[in-house]
Structures are given as C-alpha cells and as structure tokens.
Amino acid sequence: MLKSYQAGVREYRETYWDPHYTPKDSDILAVFKVIPQAGVPREEAAAAVCAESSTATWTTVWTDLLTDLDYYKGRAYAIEDVPGDDEAFYAFVAYPMGLFEEGSIVNVFTSLVGNVFGFKAVRALRLEDVRFPLWFVTTCDGPPHGIQVERDKLDKYGRPMLGCTIKPKLGLSAKNYGRAVYECLRGGLDFTKDDENVNSQPFMRWRDRFEFCQEAIEKAEQETGERKGHYLNVTAPNMEEIYRRAEFAKEIGSPIIMSDYLTIGWAAHSSLSRWCRANGMLLHVHRAMHGVIDRNPRHGINFRVLAKLLRLLGGDHLHSGTVVGKLEGDRAATLGWVDLMRERHVKEDRSRGLFFDQPWGHMAPVMPVASGGIHVWHMPALLAIFGDDAVFQFGGGTLGHPWGNAAGAAANRVALEACVRARNEGRDVEREGKDILTAAAQSSPELKVAMETWREIKFEFDVVDKLDAPHR
C-alpha cells in the first residue's frame, strides 16, 4: 500500500469536529437539536451526527485511502446551548456540495435524516433548519406555477382566496358531495377541497366525485361570473394511478388537483409536480402526517424544513397552520414558515426560528393555506397574519352555518371583503376586528348569524412545539 493504514475505532470528534471551519457558500448547512446519551461529550455527539449523516461508518476502513476524505466529509463546526433545556444543544453541520445529487431532495434527506436518527450515541435528535445554497436551489424544479400565475389563471387579485374542505370528509355519496361543492362556490368561495383521506373509497369512487365536482364548478361559475375550482385529490396507491386521475381531472377542465406529499413520497410528489407544470394544472399540497414528524420539540424534523423542501419539490399551495385555529402553530414560527414559502430571500432571524439565510433565486413562491378550526371571528387576525397571498380555508366554519352551506360561504366572503376594505383604508384590522365585522353584519344576515353561532368558540390550548424561550 502506498499509504499507511491504521485500523480500529477512533472517536468521531478526531475527524468530524472542526470548530475552526468557516462554512462555504456552496455548503448545505444543517442545525440539529441533539440530546446525547449520558456520558457522551457534546463535541463527540455532534461529530457522531455529522459523521453518520455524511461519510463515516463505525470503524476506520482501508478504502478511506482511495478517496479524498477531507474533501467529502461533513464538518460539525459549532455548538450552542438550547435556551431553557439543560439536556439538549444545537449542533451546526456543514456538508460539501460534492456529497449530493443535484436537484435530489430524496438524496439530501436520506443522508441528513437517515440512519443517524437511530444512532445509539444520541437519545433524541431533531433537524431544526437547513440552508440550501443557491446552486442546489437552482437544480430543483420548484412550484409548477406560483402565486402570480395562479392569480392570472383565476383572475383574482387584491385579497386572499377563500376555500372550504367538504365535510363530513368521509361517507358522502358523489352526488351529495357535488351538491355541497356547488352551494359553497355559489355562496362566494373561490375553492372547495377534498380532504386528505378522500381517495376512491366504496362510498364515493374517484371518477364519480371528479365528475360531480366539475359539474358543480361549471354551474357556480355560470351563476357568479367568477372562476372557481375544487382541489381534486389524486392521491392513489401507485404513481400510474395518480397520473390516470390527474389526466382525467385535466380532461374534464379542472384548474387544480391536490396530493398528500408526505404520504405519497417525495419522489412521487416531485413527478406529479412536473406533470402539473407541463399540463398547466395548479397543485394544492396537503401535509397529512406532518405532526408525526414535526410536533415533538425534541425529535423529528421541524416544519420549517418540511416547508422548504416542499418549495423545492414543487407545489402551488401548502397548508401552513393558522395560529388562531385548532391546529398546532406558534405565531412567530408560522410567520417564519410563511416567509420561507413566499419570499425570494429570507434572512436569519432567531426570533422566528430561522437559523440561516435562505436564498431562493427566481424560484416561484408557494401560497400558504390557513386551515383548521377557523371561522368568521378569525378573519381579522388571519388577514393581519398572512396578508393577501394566502388561502383561508373554512370547513366547519362554512358548512356549519345554521342556514346551510351557501350562507356559510356568503358570511365568509362578506367578512373577508369587509376586513380587506378596512385594511386598505388604513385601519388596524386585528385590533378593530370586532367593530369591522359587527358593522359588516348590519347588511349581511348570513354574517350576523355566523358571528352569533361561533361567538364563544376558541381553541386556547398551549402550543407544544414552541420556539426555544429566549428566541421568542
């Protein structure tokens, strides 16, 4: 052998801990929240995470001599305390660009959250943030169309869009499902939506649902003079069936389809996003299963990472939480997610949980969707939090109206337009929301009844996944 080779086991920190390293613009950067096993030093635990997620195995191997290990290895380059948690620490890791296939989210995350999450050296591990360098961003497809193209397609400007998830989510016949879609769209909504687990069950096969929904859309468009849509869920057992359903949605004239991007898999979702771009179809993305991955504040993947990877994979809409509704979502963190979905360049901001600058270049933005336990009383806060480029999706907050679906839709439309008008006049809609809605209800009996129905309904539970204390 030309080089000497020393077999055996070495501490990871001898090779992968480098506190003097300055990250390069081309590096993929990651920050992990690490809880090491008792007796494992922080530097060793950080280096172990770095090693297992890049080039190492448990022992030295002679084939290390056949490559430039110093070039390809990851480097754990910094450690920080986690405020308010004596057991955990943040480990910052830099990965060289040569480790990853261009444009492959699957490849990147197979390394970053692969075997390392079962590593015995750590008790718990959470991927808090990832900085994707511009070279990597430009090799990814991104959203099929983006916000501006969607507005142009639908001829809707100057306000958020309104949607509704049809309830009950399971059990309706296709004909009754289509009836609910028609009533909601006729009442003033822009979109209605399949729920995440509506696929092709015995009570409502997918083709029947698609046809009745499209009939409802066309009838509502004729009566209102507005462009309407229904998120037809093409999620299916295999990719061939996903394409078959998507093609049928296109044939009947639907402007938008949807998928459950975590349960169908990232490679499948990326393929569907490419199909949508090629076929002029908007793509709504549901995040079903995300709570399994992101809700535990000590183990898993933070949703800000899932939001970033969805923008890279491709999607025109993504559920982002509401802050004010029934689902998990810290306000500061949610605003950080929304910026990552919509802005061209997002600066590091620890107060919102953003550990790195994130450049997006010219990649199209994603429309955040606020959905889950919201009703007319939430409208002022939703507008203040999300602004115009968002979809506010009221399921029970539409279909639960005492006068029916159309009245629920009308109440939401009147509430939204009243808040937008007040905002445009310079009023503080969040602070003055009650007065704004009360005034609007004087000329809208539908809104008045909705306000009376949900006056006492609140979801005041503490957030489980909070930003770490001093960053708030």
UniProtKB/Swiss-Prot annotation:
Annotated catalysed reactions: 2 (2R)-3-phosphoglycerate + 2 H(+) = D-ribulose 1,5-bisphosphate + CO2 + H2O; D-ribulose 1,5-bisphosphate + O2 = 2-phosphoglycolate + (2R)-3-phosphoglycerate + 2 H(+)
List the active site. 167 (proton acceptor), 286 (proton acceptor)
Chain positions found as N6-carboxylysine: 193
GO molecular function (one): ribulose-bisphosphate carboxylase activity
The reply to whether Metal-binding figures as a keyword in the UniProt entry is: yes
Q: Which domain of life is it from?
A: Bacteria
A Pfam family the protein falls into: RuBisCO_large
Main enzyme class: lyase
Record-annotated site: Transition state stabilizer: 326
- Note the InterPro entries from the entry: RuBisCO, RuBisCo_large_chain_AS, RuBisCO_lsu_C, RuBisCO_lsu_C_sf, RuBisCO_lsu_fd_N, RuBisCO_lsu_N_sf, RuBisCO_lsuI
Disulfide topology:
none
Q: What is its EC number?
A: 4.1.1.39
Similarity comment text for this entry: Belongs to the RuBisCO large chain family. Type I subfamily.
Q: What does this protein do?
A: RuBisCO catalyzes two reactions: the carboxylation of D-ribulose 1,5-bisphosphate, the primary event in carbon dioxide fixation, as well as the oxidative fragmentation of the pentose substrate. Both reactions occur simultaneously and in competition at the same active site.
Q: Subunit structure, briefly? A: Heterohexadecamer of 8 large chains and 8 small chains.
Give the miscellaneous note: The basic functional RuBisCO is composed of a large chain homodimer in a 'head-to-tail' conformation. In form I RuBisCO this homodimer is arranged in a barrel-like tetramer with the small subunits forming a tetrameric 'cap' on each end of the 'barrel'.
Q: What is this protein called?
A: Ribulose bisphosphate carboxylase large chain 1
